[in-house]
Amino acid sequence: MPAPSAADFARLRSLVAIEDLDARQSRPIEEVFTGRELTTIPVGTAEDVAAAFAKARAAQRGWAHRPVAERAAIMERFRDLVAKNRDFLMDVAQAETGKARSAAQEEIVDMMLNARYYARQAVKLLAPKRVQGLLPGVVKTVVNHHPKGVVGVISPWNYPMALSISDSIPALLAGNAVVVKPDSQTPYCTLANAELLYEAGLPRDLFAVVPGPGSVVGTAIVENCDYLMFTGSTATGRTLAEQCGRRLIGFSAELGGKNPMIVTRGAKLDVAAKAATRACFSNAGQLCISIERIYVERAVADEFTAKFGEQVRSMRLAATYDFTADMGSLISEDQIKTVSGHVDDAKAKGATVIAGGNIRPDIGPRFYEPTVLTGVTDEMECARNETFGPVVSIYPVESVAEAIEKANDTEYGLNASVWAGSKTEGEAIAAQLQAGTVNVDEGYALAFGSTAAPMGGMKASGVGRRHGADGILKYTESQTVATSRVLNLDPPLGISGTLWQKAMTPMIRAVQKLPGR
């Protein structure tokens, strides 16, 4: 199966929210597997962003008044179209990112899961909710959820479909419009799904895709949006949070991680070693929730390391548009430099390479072997810094308590994995880890795929949550409407303020004793 055709890219290019496309400056888009130019993409400006927001605001007013069930029906149709066009979508994802097809399929599944969950739950989650009022029977209190307006989404290159589309689905269902800035390396991943959203019945102005540099297009989105969703580095997240703070708008972000795995002496080592290959090396480790640190009880550390090393050395690297490759390419020369820099630094300072450790230009220009290190110490760059590539370090520990302490000894707190002798032990360990998601007997997919549950980071790994009720309600403004059924709190005619306050005191005491107070 080859990369998508020139005709495919030309069709998708026409969906960019930029006027006079052919007159604009453009940048090349490369096939990561080979480094050859596939097509080009127009480069947006701040004026393009402003124009997209103007159209989005006009369209959003009518969209917000449409019944939630009508919006949900569009997302159900979108889900069906994603399933129908999944092979083409995976081709686009592989061409722009260089990931293995199994990692591309994860993006398809994620979009389908989110579209189905929110389409089925939005009516319930967004419905006015009756809550207990000040005086039962006297005061009726209802909470409404109004859309923010126009949401800005700034998405990354590593999972460019899941992290642009899946984050936009609940925003749209909540009654907002969305303006997306895809990463400059992967704009067609977003455009390919925009095409399906429009085909499903979403008005085009409600979902605008404006490609361009973050310093220009990203800044303009922050200056125009009513809420910002960002996925990317912690450093950039801090900058965007400051910009949102100055405008007093809401902000949600999934940021960096240095995710730990704990393997206890009672774990099934064969199963854990095999699962760790996917947990560490899915999308060549370019996954925010992938594992970069493994803490193993010393009694089984040598055995686990041997089994894991054998699994990793047997992985197949290939530049192929089918499911025969276990791992694909890194996306860019910058990624190659970071990964090789971390590994070379570790080797120079005494770390041992158990598997991998080499660039593989014989396969493609940006391939790097899945790499396992031991003997990593704190002065090595890979010890505490996020590599965001196919590199993991194994650390023997004396006890589970030490493993938990070391797992938590990081500025990050995005994801963690636990392999123990029983589910009960695994869950007990999980509850002590400072991570937004923890998987027991799995690396990352169980928590990430549980779309009814919130997903996000603690500490420097993020703000806010995607998925679950949190993932849609964050795109709304809560409004409390309290209605007096009988009287207000002013003294009735003919009753003095002093007498009224004396009468109110026992009433307030009685209310405080009611259930739920």
UniProtKB/Swiss-Prot annotation:
Pfam families reported in the protein's UniProt record: Aldedh
Keywords assigned: NADP, Oxidoreductase
UniProt keyword NAD present: no
Role of this protein: Catalyzes the NADP(+)-dependent oxidation of succinate semialdehyde to succinate. Although it has succinate semialdehyde dehydrogenase activity, is likely to act physiologically on a different aldehyde(s).
Catalytic reaction list: succinate semialdehyde + NADP(+) + H2O = succinate + NADPH + 2 H(+)
Entry's EC annotation: 1.2.1.79
Lineage of the organism: Bacteria, Bacillati, Actinomycetota, Actinomycetes, Mycobacteriales
Family: Belongs to the aldehyde dehydrogenase family.
Keyword check for NADP: yes
Leader peptide range in chain numbering: none
Residues reported in the UniProt entry to bind NADP(+): W157, N158, K181, P182, D183, S184, G232, S233, L255, E386
Active site per UniProt: E254, C288
CDD domains: ALDH_SSADH2_GabD2
This protein's name: Putative succinate-semialdehyde dehydrogenase [NADP(+)]
Alphabetized GO MF terms: succinate-semialdehyde dehydrogenase (NADP+) activity
